[in-house]
């Protein structure tokens, strides 16, 4: 009887272990295959930089890490005030221009509209203004944009996106300036602002693999012996390009749906030659700006100084005219 109970417990324990192991394997499999199954989000959204580089999106060289996946260079603009007073709300405008008539390659190879994203690196102490501090007029300019801090303790670094590019080629950030009177770590002076903006999907995943929004090249030198189209159970399409080398070895290049093949069977190619066009129409751009946290007292003293200088000039002019009148009177006498 005791042996039977022991065997029953062992059986239940074994089943539980097998179930746990199965769940663990399924979770790991989903984690590593999600980038392949859903590549569009992996390449297009700024939060991938947040997950891959959790400390800061800016490398020691000054390069913003979004450029590691978005390889093409495109212009990005930013508008910030030259100076701001403490504890005030102002707007920073990031402009991500592009030709809205073009379309990008989607994850399934179809043509879709471009999306945009941005990262705004503000000085320490600056952050997105609370809802109750944003004027109604500024709220209308912002629209339905959601601002996400880069980390729990990184309110001064803000990421936005993905957003539909046709509606958000200009992204308005409502920024609240810090008050040195309340935080001794904040000081008046000039600070740097770093901005990055991308439009369209990236060419490389954070894992280093190419997306289907990229150019594909030959892996070997030889003659293209076969080009075969394959369709997966999920409807995905890919092409296998077989290259036969001089030694008789066959090297296969896998090309996902999206890039257009520019080679044909029987064509001789060299390793590195393009097999497809480059479908990318987007790109990333970054730039730096400066903003001054101005002391209101200094502004007041500056105004007083300017007023004093102007008053002194007026007095000098009046004194000069008075002297001229006296000299003229003496000459007449």
Swiss-Prot record:
Belongs to the cytochrome f family. The lineage of its organism: Bacteria, Bacillati, Cyanobacteriota, Cyanophyceae, Nostocales. The keyword Ligase does not apply. Gene3D superfamilies: 2.40.50.100, Cytochrome f large domain (2.60.40.830), Single helix bin (1.20.5.700). GO terms for molecular function: electron transfer activity; heme binding; iron ion binding. GO terms for cellular component: plasma membrane-derived thylakoid membrane. GO terms for biological process: photosynthesis. The gene is petA. The keyword Endoplasmic reticulum does not apply. This is Cytochrome f. Component of the cytochrome b6-f complex, which mediates electron transfer between photosystem II (PSII) and photosystem I (PSI), cyclic electron flow around PSI, and state transitions. The chain crosses the membrane at residues 299-318. InterPro entries: Cyt-f_TM, Cyt_f, Cyt_f_lg_dom, Cyt_f_lg_dom_sf, Rudment_hybrid_motif. It comes from the Bacteria. It is a single-pass membrane protein. Residues 1-44 form the signal peptide. Its cofactor is heme. Heme binds at residues 45, 66, 69-70. Keywords: Electron transport, Heme, Iron, Membrane, Metal-binding, Photosynthesis, Signal, Thylakoid, Transmembrane, Transmembrane helix, Transport.
């Amino acid at each position: 009887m005791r042996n039977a109970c022991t065997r029953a417990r062992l059986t239940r324990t074994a089943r539980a272990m097998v179930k746990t192991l199965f769940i663990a394997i399924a979770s790991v499999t989903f984690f590593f295959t999600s980038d392949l199954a859903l590549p569009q989000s992996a390449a297009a959204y700024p939060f991938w930089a947040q997950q891959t580089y959790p400390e800061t999106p800016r490398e020691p060289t000054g390069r913003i890490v979004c450029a590691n996946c978005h390889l093409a260079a495109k212009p990005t603009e930013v508008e910030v005030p030259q100076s701001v007073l403490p504890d005030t709300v102002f707007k920073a405008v990031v402009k991500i221009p592009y030709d809205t008539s073009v379309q990008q390659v989607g994850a399934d190879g179809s043509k879709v509209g471009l999306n945009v994203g941005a990262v705004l690196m503000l000085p320490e102490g600056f952050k997105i203004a609370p809802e109750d501090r944003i004027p109604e007029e500024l709220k209308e300019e912002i629209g339905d944009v959601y601002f996400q801090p880069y980390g729990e303790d990184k309110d001064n670094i803000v990421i936005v996106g993905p957003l539909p590019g046709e509606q958000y080629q200009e992204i308005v950030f409502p920024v609240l300036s810090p008050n040195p009177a309340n935080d001794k770590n904040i000081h008046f002076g000039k600070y740097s602002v770093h901005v990055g903006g991308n439009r369209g999907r990236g060419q490389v995943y954070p894992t280093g693999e190419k997306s289907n929004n990229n150019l594909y090249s030959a892996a070997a030198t030889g003659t293209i012996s076969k080009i075969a189209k394959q369709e997966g159970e999920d409807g995905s399409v890919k092409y296998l390009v077989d290259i036969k080398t001089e030694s008789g070895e066959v090297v296969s290049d896998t090309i996902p749906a999206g890039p257009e093949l520019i080679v044909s069977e029987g064509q001789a190619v060299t390793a590195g030659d393009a097999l497809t066009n480059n479908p990318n129409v987007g790109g990333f751009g970054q730039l730096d700006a400066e903003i001054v946290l101005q002391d209101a007292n200094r502004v007041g003293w500056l105004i007083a100084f300017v007023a004093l200088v102007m008053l002194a000039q007026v007095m000098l002019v009046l004194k000069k005219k008075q002297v001229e009148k006296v000299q003229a009177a003496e000459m007449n006498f």
